[in-house]
Amino acid sequence: MDYFHYPIDRDRETIAKMVKLFPTFCEKIDKGDFYIACAMGLHRTDIALCTYWVFYAADKGTVPPPIRGYRQENGHNTNKIMRVLNAFYQYMTERDGKEPMPIEVFKERKKVVNELSKL
């Protein structure tokens, strides 16, 4: 089994690491036979998979990932996911001098993630 550490948080330093490692993260998911674990119970798996979908897999026609930790029925919401997605988008925009996708597309994808937390 191959080990790959993909950090998840919304602070600028971690977002920079996430963006840098993102192509490798996507490649590992695309190859299949992967396992994602968040040992702290902070539901970072949801955040990682939503980032993968919003910024990469949705463009390939992949269905969005199911939300397991941030479910409304369990008293949670998607605020943490949204904060990371927003920080990721902002960092990429600043780094590249252009938006990674049109803001309307980004908002629509975030809306899909929010809806998934209600299912």
Model-derived segments and their meaning:
Residues L42-I47:
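Glycine-rich nucleophile elbow surrounding the catalytic serine of serine-hydrolase chemistry
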Residues M1, Y89-L119:
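Cytosolic catalytic domains that perform sulfur/thiol-centered chemistry
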Residues A39:
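P-loop (Walker A) phosphate-binding loop of NTP-binding proteins
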Residues M1-I36, C50-A87:
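Cysteine-based protein phosphatase catalytic domain of the PTP/DSP
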